[in-house]
């Protein structure tokens, strides 16, 4: 957090000088690929979190029901982030597992709140937001952390990723996108789309997706607007020619020449 604070402050002080900056996106897709952590410092922070919540070990033991299956703690150092039990693959204590989820959410919200407070010092009337709907994160508390609203990343084509066991045509697998748009609106009545799918996608090792059919980009954009999005931006503008996201196509192809997707976007503008 020390380095996070320094970097955020330097960036805010530098870029808030420019009138062309209309707002700030904090981080990117917090808790996306990884939302569980097990380093030494994470275990220590989890103990500190529990001490603040429960005060004493006796109180924690009572609230967590640790007397069941001989889990009673006699020292704070005996507590770790939830571990697998010796009985099958489940977590031994569901109450401690819930506290772990609360701890992870608390850590992420605190991390974003720190950045928001620093940016706000010099942001003026610029908006502050973050993007994505992911696990182990209490978005109601996130909305109270200093952001003005949240953004959603809309990738309907994920439903048909070629490496999914149930991939392929049919079965309306993309309806999850409608659900997530409705969920985003419930969390943040004012919201936007930070990343609207702009073409075929995929990393170099997974989630490969076919090219959208003619009219699908326009359809997906209107889907976001129909669900209440006040802002739509596309990911990405120009297809990257290197790196893990080399197959994640933008509105522009590798050639940077006019193409069907750009023509379709012009129809969206006309709409």
Regions found by a protein language model. Give the residues of each.
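Polysaccharide-binding and catalytic clefts of secreted carbohydrate-active enzymes
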Residues: 1-149, 153-174, 237
């Amino acid at each position: 957090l020390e380095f996070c604070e320094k970097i955020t402050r330097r960036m805010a002080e530098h870029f808030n000088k420019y009138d062309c900056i209309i707002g700030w996106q904090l981080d990117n897709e917090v808790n996306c690929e990884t939302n569980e952590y097990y380093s030494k410092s994470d275990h220590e922070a989890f103990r500190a979190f529990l001490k603040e919540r429960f005060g004493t070990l006796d109180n924690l033991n009572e609230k967590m029901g640790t007397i069941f299956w001989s889990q009673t703690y006699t020292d704070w150092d005996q507590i770790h982030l939830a571990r697998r039990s010796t009985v099958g693959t489940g977590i031994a204590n569901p109450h401690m597992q819930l506290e772990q989820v609360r701890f992870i959410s608390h850590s992420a919200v605190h991390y974003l709140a720190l950045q928001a407070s620093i940016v706000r010092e010099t942001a003026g009337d610029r908006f502050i937001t973050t993007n994505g709907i992911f696990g182990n994160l209490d978005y109601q508390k996130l909305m109270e952390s200093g952001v003005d609203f949240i953004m959603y990343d809309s990738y309907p084509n994920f439903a048909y990723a070629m490496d999914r066991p149930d991939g392929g045509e049919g079965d309306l697998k993309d309806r999850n996108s409608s659900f997530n748009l409705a969920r985003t609106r419930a969390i943040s009545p004012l919201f936007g789309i930070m990343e609207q799918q702009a073409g075929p996608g995929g990393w170099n090792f997974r989630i490969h997706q076919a090219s959208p059919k003619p009219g699908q980009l326009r359809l997906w954009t209107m889907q976001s607007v129909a669900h209440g999005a006040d802002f739509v931006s596309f990911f990405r503008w120009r297809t990257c020619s290197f790196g893990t996201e080399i197959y994640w196509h933008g509105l522009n192809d590798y050639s940077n020449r006019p193409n069907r997707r750009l023509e379709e976007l012009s129809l969206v503008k006309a709409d």
